Amino acid sequence: MSLDQYLPIFLFILVGIGVGVAPQVLGYILGPNLPDSAKNSPYECGFEAFGDARMKFDVRYYLVAILFILFDLEIAFLFPWAVALKDIGALGFWSVMVFLTILVVGFIYEWKKGALDWE
């Protein structure tokens, strides 16, 4: 497999980065920069902020978000495995079973530790 086959992928990545970065750079360069106290103050639905604009969230929100990302990533790994199951054979099957076992053991550990309880 030669590197010429990766050229379209490389160009796709470059165009994607360019589409994301170019408007931000152009806005920064061409946009007016006129700061004043009204623009720099926190704003909530037409009222001045009632409390601290940077309130702390409970750690459980972050834990649930990390668990969601972990198991969402697991599904992202399982889709290509399911498509190529005929081609990868028994070794591929059992390696994914080990992967799933590790994830299930981790999930049971978190459940037993009470990480998923909202008391």
Curated annotation (Swiss-Prot):
Q: Which GO terms describe its cellular component?
A: NADH dehydrogenase complex; plasma membrane
Q: Which Gene3D superfamilies match?
A: NADH:ubiquinone/plastoquinone oxidoreductase, chain 3
EC annotation?
Answer: 7.1.1.-
Tell me the enzyme class.
translocase
**Single GO MF annotation:** quinone binding
Keywords of this entry: Cell inner membrane, Cell membrane, Membrane, NAD, Quinone, Translocase, Transmembrane, Transmembrane helix, Transport, Ubiquinone
List the catalytic activities from the record: a quinone + NADH + 5 H(+)(in) = a quinol + NAD(+) + 4 H(+)(out)
Protein's cellular compartments:
Cell inner membrane
InterPro entries, per this entry?
A: NAD(P)H_OxRDtase_bac/plastid, NADH_UbQ/plastoQ_OxRdtase_su3, NDAH_ubi_oxred_su3_sf
Annotated membrane topology is:
Multi-pass membrane protein
Transit peptide as UniProt keyword? no
Give the signal peptide, or none. none
Q: Which residues cross the membrane?
A: 9-29, 63-83, 88-108
Q: How does it assemble?
A: NDH-1 is composed of 14 different subunits. Subunits NuoA, H, J, K, L, M, N constitute the membrane sector of the complex.
Q: What does this protein do?
A: NDH-1 shuttles electrons from NADH, via FMN and iron-sulfur (Fe-S) centers, to quinones in the respiratory chain. The immediate electron acceptor for the enzyme in this species is believed to be ubiquinone. Couples the redox reaction to proton translocation (for every two electrons transferred, four hydrogen ions are translocated across the cytoplasmic membrane), and thus conserves the redox energy in a proton gradient.
User: What family is it from?
Assistant: Belongs to the complex I subunit 3 family.
Q: Which HAMAP family match?
A: NDH1_NuoA
Which protein, by its recorded name, is this? Answer: NADH-quinone oxidoreductase subunit A
Per the UniProt entry, what species is this protein from, by scientific name?
Albidiferax ferrireducens (strain ATCC BAA-621 / DSM 15236 / T118) (Rhodoferax ferrireducens)
Record lineage = Bacteria, Pseudomonadati, Pseudomonadota, Betaproteobacteria, Burkholderiales
Gene from which this protein is expressed: nuoA
